[in-house]
A protein has these predicted regions:
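Hinge/lid segment of periplasmic solute-binding proteins
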Residues: 93-144, 159, 195, 291
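Conserved N-terminal structural module of periplasmic/extracytoplasmic solute-binding proteins
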Residues: 9-10, 18-97, 160, 342, ...
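Extracytoplasmic/periplasmic substrate-recognition and gating elements
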Residues: 58-59, 156, 281-345
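Short, solvent-exposed loop/beta-turn-alpha elements that line the ligand-binding surface or hinge
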Residues: 109-121, 125, 203-232, 282-283, ...
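C-terminal capping/gating helix-and-loop segments adjacent to ligand/active sites or protein-protein/ligand interfaces
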Residues: 47-48, 66, 305, 344-418, ...
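Glycine-centered hinge/linker elements that transmit conformational signals in sensory
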Residues: 173, 215-250
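Extracytoplasmic/periplasmic solute-binding protein
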Residues: 135, 168-219
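A structural signal for short loop-to-beta-strand junctions that line the ligand-binding cleft
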Residues: 88, 116-151, 180-181, 186, ...
Length: 443
């Protein structure tokens, strides 16, 4: 294990050196080391390097800002912090306050800075930790909805649903006509994760659901598992799967298979962001439309919104006012109208900032939800994805129902543990898994 740890340290050191040389600033490592104002920014995916980095460099051509491709969760940054290498600015997408607790002592609190006043209150309701600090800020929302083949609906005389009852009826009519109602890549953890939150979206947006979520995001210790709430959530998830006519066959459906079924007109609905819908529209000889996710306990409908990224500052920045000002300049670029448009790749942006309008002109069909602020912010605790996959596959395979999910020591409590606990055993296991992938790839 000691040898493996040394291998990983060496590997990460090599990545840092390479990233320094290949960063947007185009400076060598030697040149960077001489500049105390050098700012390191880790972006969670490569597309951000292509979309937002040139814009930021254009605004600040004389500043020494280095952009590096990082990771989609906080584990990498916890490792960097342990070895004294925490970047100045970090971004992730899969995130919850609980995930980032190891980093809390090392991250800056935004609550005392003006930038917080530029956010809608609902956008930050899940971003306070147990000390009422706001160490992370979301940057622009991507609206995830159902994408429906309107032409196919009309061909069979089926109306586009406006509530959950109509959704279930439409699915049954499509099924009776030999059309798969909803093509979904349920072999993927993110789609199983979505099914639980959107199938029971009314529960997550209820007072009980909001209270549970707020407690989950901010608690410093274990979270009390709300049995009554989660029994309803599992029950509505199961109902959604059945009403959508998903079966055990869908357990193995990957993203390519699900996409192809929709593109070929064999399925009436898929899911995705505006950019994906536009891409589909260009490929299909059919009119597409968007359908929000419906509550099963009311006539309300909601957009499932995912922040494009979540951003945090290294606390050490507060010791250097010039670097801190530069870091805020970078953040300002990101939350500006131009920056949000670039981050979202030009289509469909739900602005979380009061001084930047929503950019949904090219995304019709969601006006009511936008005007009513009916937006659900996706819960993205890292380990909740695996728990969701196990739960949905258990329901589809018939190995368990919602009652068994609650009773068994596995899934019901697994959700609580996987959502909220990072045990030393799991940490060790994920480290070994990551290391094995690195070594395999290297060899």
């Amino acid at each position: 294990m000691k040898k493996a740890k040394h291998y990983l340290i060496a590997l990460l050191s090599g990545v840092l050196v390479a990233a320094t040389v290949l960063s947007g600033c185009g400076q060598s490592k030697k040149e960077v080391s001489k500049n105390n104002d050098h700012l390191t920014v880790y972006l969670w995916e490569n597309s951000l390097m292509k979309n937002i980095v040139p814009y930021i460099h254009e605004q600040f051509p004389d500043q020494d800002i280095e952009f590096i491709t990082g990771n989609n969760d906080t584990d990498l940054y916890s490792y960097f912090e342990e070895h004294g290498e925490l970047p100045d600015i970090i971004t992730v997408r899969r995130f919850s306050g609980k995930d980032a607790q190891d980093l809390e002592p090392y991250l800056m609190d935004f609550a005392s800075y003006d930038v917080v006043s530029r956010y809608y209150s609902y956008a930050l309701q899940y971003y306070k930790n147990s000390k009422d600090e706001i160490q992370w800020l979301p940057v622009c929302g991507m609206p995830q909805t159902i994408i429906a083949n309107k032409t196919l609906f009309e061909q069979y005389g089926i109306k586009i649903p406006k509530n959950y009852k109509e959704y279930a009826q439409a699915c049954q009519q499509l099924y009776d006509n030999g059309i798969k109602p909803y093509s979904l890549d349920l072999a993927e953890d993110w789609s199983a994760h979505e099914v639980i939150q959107t199938g029971a979206i009314g529960e997550f947006m209820s007072l009980d659901g909001i209270e549970w979520r707020s407690s989950a995001e901010s608690a410093s210790g274990d979270i009390a598992f709300d049995d009554a709430l989660w029994k309803r959530i599992f029950s509505e998830t199961n109902t959604f799967l059945k009403d959508s006519h998903f079966t055990s066959d869908d357990i193995s459906v990957d993203i390519n298979t699900a996409t192809q079924m929709f593109l070929e007109g064999k399925a009436a609905m898929f899911h995705g962001y505006p950019a994906l819908m536009q891409e589909f529209q260009e490929q299909m000889d059919a009119e597409l439309t968007r359908i929000p996710f419906f509550s099963q306990i009311s006539d309300e409908a909601f957009i499932n919104m995912t922040p494009s990224l979540n951003i945090a500052f290294n606390k050490e920045l507060e010791k250097d006012q010039e670097k801190l000002d530069l870091a805020f300049d970078v953040l300002e670029c990101m939350i500006s109208k131009e920056g949000q448009t670039l981050i979202a790749d030009g289509k469909g942006v739900i602005s979380l900032n009061v001084d930047v309008p929503n950019m949904m002109e090219d995304v019709p069909g969601l006006e009511d939800e936008i005007n009513n602020n009916s937006v659900y912010i996706r819960y993205s605790a890292q380990k909740s994805f695996d728990a969701s996959l196990k739960a949905v596959h258990g329901l589809l395979s018939g190995e368990m129902d919602e009652t068994q999910l609650m009773k068994e020591s596995g899934i019901a409590r697994t959700f609580n543990q996987l959502f909220f606990s990072i045990s030393s055993l799991l940490t060790f296991f994920h480290f070994l898994l990551y290391l094995s992938k690195v070594i395999t790839k290297d060899n």
